């Protein structure tokens, strides 16, 4: 049975992209998104426009995961064309590459450490720490983890968390966050002015709301689920954080397509250089990966994840308050 660093080494053969496949999935997903967005404006009936709007929100999630893989240098690395495409996409979804790369790289190196800064992830307090907090500190902590905050991830995670907060913290290092906000709101104002508010709702509001909510929840649930394990900095290991603190999300084939296999999150955390389309290969090839801790998008699992608030050190599990 493979353990520890042996597991990481076992994944290395899969950390090689098929360049043609990477381009195919990138371009095809981009074209599907463009077609869906066009369908929100030009269509036979408002119900078809609404269907295109909802589907566009889901496709944005897929393209975001592909963008995320490019940021990890798992696909299309050193391609100027790919870099240009994904830079523009990062502006479009309010996740510019500068702050996204910095915060997400930190997340991978510190995933599920109890006593690290909550950069690029949802904060985790121990039960004792929470009890010692002031009312305002408790409110802030619970607000960040609240279901409504995650539902409105477009505003709180992306618009504020990725862009506004990054500029407040370090403006000189995050000029691209300002560019993202300017471009993002310029295109929305143009749509609202020239195509009217009904089109703005279908072309802009619904797709961004759906993708923001789903993206935020996926990121939350993949590290905040009932059987998750958190450890101190001294006990932390990279492979342990992947297997014990990152979930496998059980999804149907369509939702695996929408999420570009990011539900195989424990494998992604074991080796972030594995292209998204090869994650199922690792699942099939390495038996140890199939013993992952799981969650899903079923209502009971979503409720179970949202009930988790603090880490109980004595019980060694996440609990409610």
Question: What is each PLM-predicted segment?
Answer:
Residues 55-63, 209-216:
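Alpha-helical transmembrane segments and their membrane-interface exit regions
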Residues 88-89, 258:
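Short alpha-helical scaffolding segments that buttress acidic/His motifs in well-ordered protein cores
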Residues 181, 253-260:
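A glycine-rich, aromatic-flanked flexible loop/lid motif
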Residues 216-254, 297:
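Membrane-interfacial segments at transmembrane helix termini in multi-pass membrane proteins
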């Amino acid at each position: 049975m493979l353990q520890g660093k042996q597991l990481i080494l076992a994944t290395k053969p899969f950390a090689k992209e098929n360049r043609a496949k990477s381009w195919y999935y990138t371009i095809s997903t981009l074209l599907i998104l463009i077609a869906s967005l066009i369908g929100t404006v030009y269509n036979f009936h408002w119900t078809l426009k609404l269907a295109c709007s909802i589907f566009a929100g889901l496709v944005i999630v897929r393209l975001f995961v592909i963008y995320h893989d490019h940021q990890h240098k798992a696909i299309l690395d050193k391609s100027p064309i790919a870099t240009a495409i994904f830079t523009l996409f990062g502006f479009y979804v309010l996740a510019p590459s500068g702050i996204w790369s910095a915060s997400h790289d930190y997340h991978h190196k510190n995933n599920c450490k109890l006593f690290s800064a909550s950069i690029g992830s949802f904060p985790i307090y121990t039960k004792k720490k929470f009890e010692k907090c002031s009312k305002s500190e408790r409110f802030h902590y619970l607000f960040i983890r609240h279901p409504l905050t995650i539902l409105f991830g477009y505003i709180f995670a992306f618009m504020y968390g990725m862009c506004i907060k990054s500029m407040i913290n370090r403006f000189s290092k995050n000029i691209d966050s300002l560019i993202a906000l300017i471009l993002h709101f310029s295109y929305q104002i143009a749509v609202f002015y020239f195509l009217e508010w009904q089109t703005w709702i279908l072309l802009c509001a619904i797709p961004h709301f759906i993708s923001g909510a789903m993206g935020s929840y996926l990121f939350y649930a993949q590290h905040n689920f009932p059987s998750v394990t958190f450890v101190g900095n001294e006990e932390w290991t990279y492979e342990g954080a992947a297997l014990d603190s990152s979930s496998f999300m059980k999804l149907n084939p369509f939702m695996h397509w929408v999420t570009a296999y990011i539900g195989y999150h424990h494998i992604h955390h074991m080796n972030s250089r594995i292209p998204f389309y090869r994650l199922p290969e690792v699942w099939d090839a390495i038996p140890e990966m199939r013993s992952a801790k799981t969650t899903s998008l079923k209502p009971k699992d979503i409720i179970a994840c949202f009930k988790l608030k603090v880490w109980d050190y004595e019980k060694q599990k996440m609990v409610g308050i």
